[in-house]
C-alpha cells in the first residue's frame, strides 16, 4: 500500500471506531482487531488495489463516524433506547420526508412510466 495515504486512512478508521464505539470496550476492541487484520492482509497489494483499498477505508471511517450511533435500553421489558448521538453524527433535514406526500412527483408509475 502507499505508505502515507494508507497510514492516514488507518488512523482515520481507528479514530472513527473510537468515536462510534465510545464506552463499549468489547465492540471497540473487536473493531480495532478487525481494522488491524484488514490492513495487514492488504499490506502487499499493488498500487491500483492500494488506492481502492485506501478509498474504501476512508468511506468506512466516514460511515462509522457519521452514521453509527449506540443505543442503550432504558428500561427492562420496554423497547425504548437512549441513543448516544455525538457531534459527528449526521443529522438530516428530513426534506425528502416532508416533500414525499406533497404530490410533487416527477415520474409516475413504475420505473418512471405513466402508470398505465
From Swiss-Prot:
InterPro entries: Complex1_LYR_LYRM7 (IPR045298), MZM1/LYRM7 (IPR050435). The lineage of its organism: Eukaryota, Fungi, Dikarya, Ascomycota, Pezizomycotina. Its main location: mitochondrion. Residues 89-116 are annotated as: Disordered. Keywords: Chaperone, Mitochondrion, Transit peptide. Belongs to the complex I LYR family. MZM1 subfamily. It comes from Fusarium vanettenii (strain ATCC MYA-4622 / CBS 123669 / FGSC 9596 / NRRL 45880 / 77-13-4) (Fusarium solani subsp. pisi). It comes from the Eukaryota. One of its GO terms (molecular function) is protein folding chaperone. One of its GO terms (biological process) is mitochondrial respiratory chain complex III assembly. CDD domains: Complex1_LYR_LYRM7. Assembly factor required for Rieske Fe-S protein RIP1 incorporation into the cytochrome b-c1 (CIII) complex. Functions as a chaperone, binding to this subunit within the mitochondrial matrix and stabilizing it prior to its translocation and insertion into the late CIII dimeric intermediate within the mitochondrial inner membrane. Modulates the mitochondrial matrix zinc pool. GO terms for cellular component: mitochondrial matrix. This is Mitochondrial zinc maintenance protein 1, mitochondrial. Interacts with RIP1. Signal peptide: none annotated.
Amino acid at each position: 500500500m502507499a505508505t502515507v495515504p494508507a497510514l492516514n486512512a488507518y488512523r482515520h478508521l481507528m479514530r472513527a471506531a473510537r468515536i462510534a464505539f465510545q464506552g463499549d470496550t468489547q465492540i471497540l476492541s473487536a473493531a480495532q482487531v478487525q481494522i488491524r487484520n484488514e490492513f495487514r492482509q492488504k499490506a502487499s497489494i499493488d498500487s491500483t488495489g492500494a488506492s481502492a483499498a485506501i478509498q474504501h477505508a476512508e468511506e468506512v471511517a466516514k460511515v462509522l463516524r457519521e452514521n453509527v450511533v449506540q443505543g442503550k435500553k432504558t428500561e427492562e421489558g420496554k423497547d425504548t433506547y437512549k441513543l448516544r448521538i455525538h457531534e459527528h453524527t449526521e443529522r438530516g433535514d428530513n426534506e425528502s420526508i416532508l416533500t414525499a406526500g406533497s404530490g410533487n412527483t416527477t415520474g409516475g408509475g413504475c420505473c418512471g412510466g405513466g402508470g398505465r
